[in-house]
Curated annotation (Swiss-Prot):
GO MF terms held by the record: electron transfer activity
Quaternary structure, from the entry: Heterodimer of FixA and FixB.
This protein's name: Protein FixA
SUPFAM superfamilies: Adenine nucleotide alpha hydrolases-like
Record-stated family: Belongs to the ETF beta-subunit/FixA family.
Domain of life: Bacteria
Gene3D superfamilies in the record: HUPs (3.40.50.620)
BP term (GO), one: carnitine metabolic process
Family annotation (HAMAP family): FixA (MF_01055)
Keyword Transport annotated: yes
Keywords on record: Electron transport, Transport
Length: 256
């Protein structure tokens, strides 16, 4: 059973600064880290490996220069995957969901897989699109919002997901793509033994050309900016007469 767990390197939120001039975000001092939601996918993949006959877990990511960081690679491998594949190319530096999904699908096809796991979204964009797009591109079943994996056989995965007022149980034929929610597990903190052992695990570095990827994005990200801050007006209307109610309604209309 070959399981691929996808992850994304994202800027550490606490290091992101806001430029006062135009509200744009400054990522220059932000270290890269594994997207919090993908930690659940990595943990789920490694738990499934224990159930699968001859299970193997491959961590897979596409991106820019952040993926060259040796510390980041070691962090991923210390969490349980048997190997790591990173696809590094400048065009993936600010990739949007469609481009990311296309590259992940191409890389997964090259690596070979029975099951692909990913987080429901990423810590930066949280578009919640990539997992479903990968399934669509590969023309295989794709399910998101999975909160529990019940069982795994050679050809079927049975899962649960929480809907608004009910719990849905699904049997998914393999190969498939599953996007897991944060409810599925609590990611473990790697032990010192796991951290030291991560350095011995194989890492493959591919380029966009290696996976036959040469598609140009139909659109590109132009700017990421923080919401403009509005000063509070601190309008206090005293009394409960008709004039006060009318004044309240008038001020309310101005802000909606």
């Amino acid at each position: 059973m070959k399981i691929i767990t996808c992850y994304k390197c994202v800027p550490d939120e606490q290091d992101i600064a806001v430029n006062n001039a135009d509200g744009s975000l400054d990522f220059s001092k932000a270290d890269a880290k594994i997207s919090q939601y993908d930690l659940n996918a990595i943990e789920a993949a490694c738990q499934l490996k224990q159930q699968a006959a001859e299970g193997q877990v491959t961590a897979l990511s596409v991106g820019g220069k952040a993926l060259t960081n040796a510390k980041g690679r070691k962090d991923v491998l210390s969490r349980g995957p048997d190997e790591l594949i990173v696809v590094i190319d400048d065009q993936f530096e600010q990739a949007l969901p469609q481009q990311t999904a296309s590259a992940l699908a191409a890389a997964a096809q090259k690596a070979g897989f029975d099951l692909i796991l990913c987080g429901d979204g990423s810590s930066d964009l949280y578009a919640q699109q990539v997992g479903l797009l990968v399934g669509e591109i590969l023309n295989i079943p794709a399910v998101n919002g999975v909160s529990k994996i019940i069982s795994l056989t050679a050809d079927t995965l049975t899962v649960e997901r929480e809907l608004e007022d009910e719990t849905e149980t699904l049997s998914i034929p393999l190969p498939a793509v599953v996007a897991v929610s944060t409810d599925i597990n609590s990611p473990q903190i790697p032990s010192m033994k796991a951290i030291l052992g991560a350095a011995k695990k194989p890492v493959q570095v591919w380029s966009a050309a290696d996976i036959g990827f040469n598609a140009e994005a139909a659109w590109s990200e132009q700017q990421v900016a923080a919401p403009k801050q509005r000063e509070r007006q601190r309008i206090v209307i005293e009394g409960d007469g008709e004039e006060q109610i009318a004044a309240f309604a008038e001020n309310l209309r101005k802000v909606i």
